[in-house]
Amino acid sequence: MIRISSRRMCRLILSIVSFLMFGVHAAQASETNIRVTDLAERTVILSHPAKRIILGESRYLFALSILNPDHPLDNIVGMLADLQSIDPGTYQQYQQRFPEIDDIPRVGHTSADSFSVEKVLSLNADLAIFGVEGHGPGARNAQLIDQLERAGVTVLFIDFRNDPLVNTVKSMRLLGHVLGQNTRADAFVEYYQAQLDRVVKPLAIAMAKHPQHSPAVFLHSRVGLQDLCCETMARGMMAAFLDNVGGQNIAKERVPGSAGILNLEYLLTEQPDIYIATAIGAAQNLEADAANQPPYIVLGAGVSRSDAQASFQRAIKESALGSLTAVRNGHAYAIWHHFYNTPLNIAAVQVFAKWLYPQTFADLDPHATLETLYQRFQPVPLNGTYWVELDTKAGRS
């Protein structure tokens, strides 16, 4: 018979208890891990909601603000500079409400090539939020992703660009999980889906009862950015909005990728029923020397309807697109380009529906939808013009 002293027995018991407690804590830690599959189909695991975040595109502030509208910048330790340079109107709104936005370190400019891994690692980030594709690092930047994850920075991919009407909901739910804001994410998703149904369901009913001609649409992207006529979107981005409302995108059969060029001769031959331009100009462009400014269409934060209309008139005049039948017949419209990269895109979908099928959607009010999105889910007020119809009478005066 083996005898064990009381002292050794106590040590043994303590060891066993410690071992068991370690196992319990390990199991609890495992159970509390946040585990999701991102939109690059990668398994992403966090031990706790992210507290130090890198934004691969600072335009994702729209999404983060939905989850934390009172303090959207609190956990952001670094971001690309795209919002300030590409959408200065919105940046100025944030700057006025949250002056500390200027103090957030920039980890790059407006491209993946400018993204600084070294800068990110110096900021002790625990999560980097990237788009599957876009201005910042994407899913194809395997080496960069590997560098970050080896250094302990978890990478999460979201998407408002490639398949926006499917992936906006998925992206917001992912962000809700990793940031510990599921309730806010669910509230947004509920509103978003209800507003999408206001397009999808009436359109399906109308098509079933009275099959109608799908309008041929030319989607003119980033008007004024280059002299060459005319950049367009064929797949994803705003082309996906067009697909969702049953529009016939005339670029789809001519452009093999997501974006490309259709020349003016082709447009004059095909003569789309509807012309939609995307506007990359901002209020700040109006403050500069107009004579030296490209013919941007100006829309977005801080832009009046009259200024938007004047910029649209100028862009049409300088591009020679006034000869399009759609323009002459009063079926020419412009919309804020950056809808394609934010979860506020549902307002743009409703606008497209109303432009293509005005009778079916006579009672739909996209402006009210956008107002609600800002009132419920954004930290800054809706203040500006985000779409406009070309005033053909003004053009002939």
PLM feature segments, named:
Residues 1-5, 19-22, 266:
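A general, composition-driven signal for non-globular sequence regions
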Residues 2-14:
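Bacterial N-terminal signal peptides that target proteins for export
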Residues 11-23:
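Bacterial N-terminal signal peptides
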Residues 27-397:
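N-terminal ligand-binding lobe of clamshell/alpha-beta domains
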